Amino acid sequence: QKILPVSRILLGGALESPGAEVTPGVLSALAVPVSTKNPDPYEISGQLQGRRLALAKWIVDPRNPLTARSVVNRVWQHHFGKPLAGNPNNFGSKGAKPTHLGLLDWLAADFMEHGWKLKRLHRMIMLSATYRQSGSHPRLDKLKNEDSDNSLFAYHLPRRLTAEEMRDSLLVATGELSHVQGGFPVMPEINMEVALQPRMIQFSLSPAYQPSRTPGERNRRTIY
């Protein structure tokens, strides 16, 4: 029978400075136990198998107050350019309070009830009256004065596109987008001056950047 390796706290994050021994467990601050049968309900069983599964089940436990809310908050931010709850990287009691707490909770509950399906969540948001609002408003100046950052989502604010979205859109518009998926990593064309610079990989110099040979290989989707 295999013995579990001992895990220790690394002081300062350094491998050379192991500290006290630590056992697998979850955040007790969230008050969502792994099992009430264990002496420590927040400790994951010491068995060799099942530790990752136990952690995964704890993450998606309906009682977990963060996971579903964090996901729907991110999706909302993607579509509107700003989240319902500010500080999405620091989600929780120390972050900014949600502007629409009831909506955030409802979206999170609906998301879990329907199997954590992201496509359904995207579709629901994009078909909403809020998402389909115009950027103009009969009292736009008054709204901007009273709600300068549009935290109430009274009108549509243009969202900055990512470089990946812009590249894919250009390839679609020109009819050059390749819909092939899988296989080796794609190397798109980049600025020649950048491509000719030697690359540092694993502490050694690598040859200059070489794009994939044919347009069919280069013009794959940036985002899957």
Language-model features, listed with the residues they occupy:
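Primarily short, surface-exposed interaction patches in extracytoplasmic proteins
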Residues: 1-221
